[in-house]
Design a protein with these regions (language model features):
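Alpha-helical substrate-binding/gating segment
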Residues: 115-127, 138-164
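Serine-hydrolase catalytic-loop signature spanning alpha/beta hydrolases and amidase-signature enzymes
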Residues: 5-9
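Glycine-rich Rossmann NAD(P)(H)-binding loop
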Residues: 99-106, 128-139, 161-171
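Catalytic helix-loop patch of NAD(P)-dependent Rossmann-fold dehydrogenases
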Residues: 11-29, 33, 37-38, 47-102, ...
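Conserved NAD(P)H cofactor-binding loop of Rossmann-fold oxidoreductase domains
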Residues: 1-4, 43-45
């Protein structure tokens, strides 16, 4: 589990860091004595230093994050890398998966575009967009999920663990 909302991270930065970073570290520490397994830790595409480039971020781009959510998730990336190199010794395959904005069933969180639109329509209220000029690449939640499962299967066979980006086609 994680604290998944940027705006919530401003309201509760300590809780965000405790949940996202220490929650992951506790999990990593628990599995370090396993004989073998394949783990995918899902972070976010917001782990990158935001340089406002005109291309999609690549896995080896600089990590950063100016808000508590993004920087805590970048720290999760570093924790996974540290445990991979310090404790796992190829017996535990662990990769990070960085996905962007997803839509799909089960997401009724506050301040999410699809649930907020549905709620506004049901209650005949005006939908308020936080950043109407923003353009975001959306993908259905099952698309990256399929990728995570495929990655977990492949990393068991190939013994390679890295960071991977999951996003929609650039169309």
């Amino acid at each position: 589990a994680a604290q998944p909302l940027v705006r919530e991270s401003y309201k509760n930065p300590i809780s965000t860091w405790e949940t996202n970073v220490m929650g992951t570290i506790n999990l990593l520490n628990t599995i370090k004595d396993f004989k073998s397994c394949s783990i995918i830790v899902v972070t976010t595409d917001k782990v990158y230093e935001n340089n406002s480039w005109n291309y999609c971020y690549r896995e080896n781009d600089l990590l950063g994050g100016h808000d508590p959510y993004s920087s805590s998730k970048a720290s999760v990336e570093l924790a996974v890398k540290s445990w991979r190199k310090s404790f796992f010794n190829n017996k535990i395959k662990i990769s990070t998966a960085r996905a962007g904005n997803v839509i799909g069933g089960g997401d009724w969180a506050h301040e999410r575009i699809v649930p907020d639109t549905i709620k506004a329509l049901i209650h005949k209220e005006t939908l308020v967009l936080r950043y109407p000029e923003a353009v975001r690449p959306w993908q259905h939640v099952l698309d990256p999920l399929y990728g995570y499962i495929t990655l977990a299967e492949k990393q068991i066979k190939k013994q390679k663990s890295y960071a991977y980006n999951f996003g929609p086609d650039d169309k």
